[in-house]
Amino acid sequence: MMKPVMLSVYGAENVCASCVNMPTAKDTYEWLEAALKRKYPNQPFEMQYIDIHEPPDNEHAKELAEKIRNDEYFYPLVLVEDKIVGEGNPKLKDVYEEMEKHGYTENR
């Protein structure tokens, strides 16, 4: 059994200024979770939502949250393990490709 990968979605309650008419970060989190469970059933993964205004007590998370607040990245920012796979309007295809690099296989 492979180790479940960690997907992180960074964001805030409000939609980013450059992302008007896009889903919120929490909506993106829920959408990603549902899509991944359908694509990779019985293949566990972990997900975490990180509020950029109240990141956990973890240097990496604090650093990324600060970069987002400083407009170095758009949010929602999506990571698979520690690799950024999407920002602003993440593409499922990019998330799937990274998941498959970690051994996940499509439900057929």
From Swiss-Prot:
SUPFAM superfamilies (alphabetical): Thioredoxin-like (SSF52833)
Keyword annotations of the record: Disulfide bond, Redox-active center
Cysteines joined through disulfide linkages: 16-19
Keyword Disulfide bond: yes
Cross-referenced InterPro entries: DUF1462 (IPR009190), Thioredoxin-like_sf (IPR036249), YuzD-like_sp (IPR038218)
Pfam family, one: DUF1462
Keyword Phosphoprotein tagged: no
This protein's name: Putative disulfide oxidoreductase YuzD
